[in-house]
Amino acid sequence: MKSIIDVKNLSFRYKENQNYYDVKDITFHVKRGEWLSIVGHNGSGKSTTVRLIDGLLEAESGEIVIDGQRLTEENVWNIRRQIGMVFQNPDNQFVGATVEDDVAFGLENQGLSRQEMKKRVEEALALVGMLDFKKREPARLSGGQKQRVAIAGVVALRPAILILDEATSMLDPEGRRELIGTVKGIRKDYDMTVISITHDLEEVAMSDRVLVMKKGEIESTSSPRELFSRNDLDQIGLDDPFANQLKKSLSQNGYDLPENYLTESELEDKLWELL
């Protein structure tokens, strides 16, 4: 499958006189339609990397190619039209007095008719389950509802790439599951490429590949299953998945379980076989 993002030998530091790089000579790609999770400890370079991809920061060296176009100062605004970002705190993204005004805001500079704008706003809000709240003030929404509205604002723009920068980190477990389910549906309906920066295991499990960053460099790239089989997850800012913890406990008590990582549903099926 063709890559929609190619990052080659990318380096960046926030201050020219600092003796270390925040992102150091990284190279990776993202396939069209893929869900890539980026994980690692705070300060490992995750958020800096996606801000470089979106053109919010300018690299010191290396190149970024988005859908065949090399990112430059001249085309950064055109390339940004292909990318939508949702951040950790949705309050920083709200500009409209109502939910529907906020979702419509980004469409106003696209030369769309009022009818098309209204259609896109309602489709996006329906997709994230927030159509009934379109007249509500954003400040009166819960954290999970605010994040869904923020995603609706991005989806209405029809970007090819959706970047979630720790978008689920401030939500409770139920809110996280709902938001991850929403993103899963959007990806399927719009064939969207997703990059998520996260510490959430459920979010990582939904992805096709996982890129681990450490001290500004790429430590490894693997499938979620391969990642969860590692014994050093705490060293890269992740907890051991519950299914892994349970499997280890059961194995210690005499249950013959396979060595490879099992999802919770796979573990449940295996236990039924053993009982």
UniProtKB/Swiss-Prot annotation:
The record's Pfam families line, in alphabetical order, gives: ABC_tran
Q: Where is the ABC transporter domain?
A: 5-240
What GO terms fall under cellular component here? Answer: ATP-binding cassette (ABC) transporter complex
The record lists ATP as bound by G40, H41, N42, G43, S44, G45, K46, S47
The UniProt family comment states: Belongs to the ABC transporter superfamily. Energy-coupling factor EcfA family.
Where's it mainly located? membrane
- Entry's EC annotation: 7.-.-.-
Assembly and binders: Forms a stable energy-coupling factor (ECF) transporter complex composed of 2 membrane-embedded substrate-binding proteins (S component), 2 ATP-binding proteins (A component) and 2 transmembrane proteins (T component).
Q: Where in the cell is it found?
A: Cell membrane
Q: Which InterPro entries match?
A: AAA+_ATPase, ABC_transporter-like_ATP-bd, ABC_transporter-like_CS, ABC_transpr_CbiO/EcfA_su, ECF_ABC_transporter_ATP-bd, EcfA_1, P-loop_NTPase
**This protein's superkingdom?**
Bacteria
Q: GO terms for molecular function, please?
A: ATP binding; ATP hydrolysis activity; ATPase-coupled transmembrane transporter activity
Organism, by scientific name, is: Streptococcus pneumoniae serotype 2 (strain D39 / NCTC 7466)
Cross-referenced PROSITE patterns: ABC_TRANSPORTER_1 (PS00211), ABC_TRANSPORTER_2 (PS50893), CBIO (PS51246)
The membrane-topology field of this record reads:
Peripheral membrane protein
Q: Give the protein name, as stated in the record.
A: Energy-coupling factor transporter ATP-binding protein EcfA1
Which keywords are on file for this protein? ATP-binding, Cell membrane, Membrane, Nucleotide-binding, Translocase, Transport
**What is this protein for, i.e. what is its function?**
ATP-binding (A) component of a common energy-coupling factor (ECF) ABC-transporter complex. Unlike classic ABC transporters this ECF transporter provides the energy necessary to transport a number of different substrates.
